[in-house]
Structure formats: C-alpha cells, structure tokens
C-alpha cells in the first residue's frame, strides 16, 4: 500500500526548496543593497564647502543631530533660498542648505526660518540677523581678483548688507603700486553669500566658507603637531 503522506512530502519537497531559494536570494540582494547604500553614505562628504546652513544653525555635528529633516525652515523662507538636500546633494539628505553663489541669504530681520524650527537646530536665541554666523567670506582668488591686477572693483564692498563693516577696501603696496584689496572683518561677516553672488568673475574671487574652514580652525589632526 502506498503511503500517501510520503508521496505528498516528496512532491512538496522541490516546491519548498524553490521557495527557500527565492527567499534566500531576496535576502541576499537586500543585504547587498543595504551594505552598498551604507558604503555610499559613509563615503559621501558630510557637507561640501559651498553648502551653507540657515541663520541660527548649531555647529555642524550638533545641527545634524538636532535637525529632524522636517522642512519647516524651507517652507518658512519667503524667497525660496533654502533647499532640502536630496540624495545627490553635497549635504546630509533632508537637511536645509543654501549656496551663496546662486542664492544668498537675504537676511530677513525676523529670521522666519529659525523661528519655524521645532527642535532648536536653528537656534531661537538668534534675534538679531546681523549676529548670524552662516559662514565667513574669504578672498580666495588672489591671482584672479581684479584689484590684485591693479584695477579697482568694489562690488563686494557695495553689495554687502553689513555695509561699511564686514568688507572694506584696504591699501597695500606691491610692484604695481598701491592696490585697494577687499578685506573681510570675520567678526562682522554673517556669511550671507551676497558678495560671492555678485562677484563679476566667472569663478568668484571671494567665497563663502563654513567658518571652521574659512578661518582655519584647528582640528583633531593638529594635536601634537606643534
């Protein structure tokens, strides 16, 4: 007499093996995708030098920890200056940023972006926009700035919203004679990006950088090297 249970088991066995193989393949693919995604995320720079945070932003590590990627600050910006970083942007995904060369911060007196932040990633303690610290302007193009070539350009000085304080022309002497060189007072500069936006060169001679880069703040690698 044929054991029907045994026959049924033999018939079902290949089907079970097929199901298991499919499950294992899917798990394997998911694992590879997860590992690849993590590797890509880990290899990306946390924030490119051209990417600036909204006014009131905490220092970068604290900001990334406090920001919940809600986008309320972006919605609150009346001039659509702020953007939420996507996968392809040079900043942690979902965090707000702006690029001074294309769209500088207009320094709204009531700082609506900071007021909209629910977590304090953009500090509510910032009440005077002139005290904002989004970055610092740095004259990086000593070879390209028109003033270093003996001409006189004052665009960056004239468009600065902290006029007469953050950027001024200072005289220096070299083989070309007396030059008028744009000079930034880092204690007054808010990092809005207006000077970089309006630089007449195709590659701006004055650039906005995160303050720790622009002022050369010492990092962990400097320990024991002096």
UniProtKB/Swiss-Prot annotation:
[4Fe-4S] cluster 1 binds at residues 67, 70, 73, 77. [4Fe-4S] cluster 4 binds at residues 189, 192, 195, 199. GO terms for molecular function: 4 iron, 4 sulfur cluster binding; metal ion binding. Residues 59-87, 95-127, 136-172, 180-211 form the 4Fe-4S ferredoxin-type domain. InterPro entries: 4Fe4S_Fe-S-bd, 4Fe4S_Fe_S_CS, MauM_NapG. Pfam families: Fer4_7. The keyword Flavoprotein does not apply. [4Fe-4S] cluster 2 binds at residues 105, 108, 113, 117. [4Fe-4S] cluster 3 binds at residues 145, 153, 156, 160. CDD domains: DMSOR_beta_like. Keywords: 4Fe-4S, Electron transport, Iron, Iron-sulfur, Metal-binding, Repeat, Transport. The keyword Methyltransferase does not apply. Pathway: One-carbon metabolism; methylamine degradation. Involved in electron transfer. This is Methylamine utilization ferredoxin-type protein MauM. It comes from Methylophilus methylotrophus (Bacterium W3A1). The lineage of its organism: Bacteria, Pseudomonadati, Pseudomonadota, Betaproteobacteria, Nitrosomonadales.
